Amino acid sequence: MEAVHDFYPILFLVILFIVLYIAIKTGVFAHFKETFRLQNLLWLLGFVIVGYILGNIAHYLYLRFVPALDTIVENEATNNFVDSFLPTWFVYILMVVIAPIYEELMFREYFYRFFSHKWLAYILSILLFTLIHTRLTWSFFEYLPMSVIVTSTFHRYKRVSDSIIVHGGYNLMVLIFHIII
């Protein structure tokens, strides 16, 4: 099991570097500097905070209305799957850095390039991102607000670096509060 435990982080990193290489070669990060202008960073921080608040409201409603047994089974299945083959330190890096980069490139940047109608890309991006994270369970409604926030962030200027920062910032807030509480 130890060999598998060490293999997955390497595999994830190789896939990430391939996706990043393609993104750089196709000019995805051409407007990267605009992301780090102070006014834009303040907007992104606002998106993270609003996303976190909406995510917590959705989480509360999810726990309030979905039967407790279903909630426990859904969360344990995901946690056990990830914990079974990844070291804890890598799960944190995966959550805050790797997943936001990979998912934003796939669900925002490439989705918008594939669909010529931007509102169709917007709706499908939200729905598929949420479905991938929830596997058609009631937790769909828990993930939906964050999916809307991150997709709206990208939709605003069509800059994937903006949505990567919001996605990573949101995941970082979730991680910090999960560790603290």
Swiss-Prot record:
It is a multi-pass membrane protein. InterPro entries: CAAX_protease (IPR052710), Rce1/LyrA-like_dom (IPR003675). The keyword Transmembrane applies. The keyword Cell membrane applies. Pfam families: Rce1-like. The chain crosses the membrane at residues 10-30, 41-61, 81-101, 114-134, 161-181. It is found in: Cell membrane. One of its GO terms (molecular function) is endopeptidase activity. This is UPF0177 protein YbdI. It comes from Lactococcus lactis subsp. lactis (strain IL1403). The lineage of its organism: Bacteria, Bacillati, Bacillota, Bacilli, Lactobacillales.
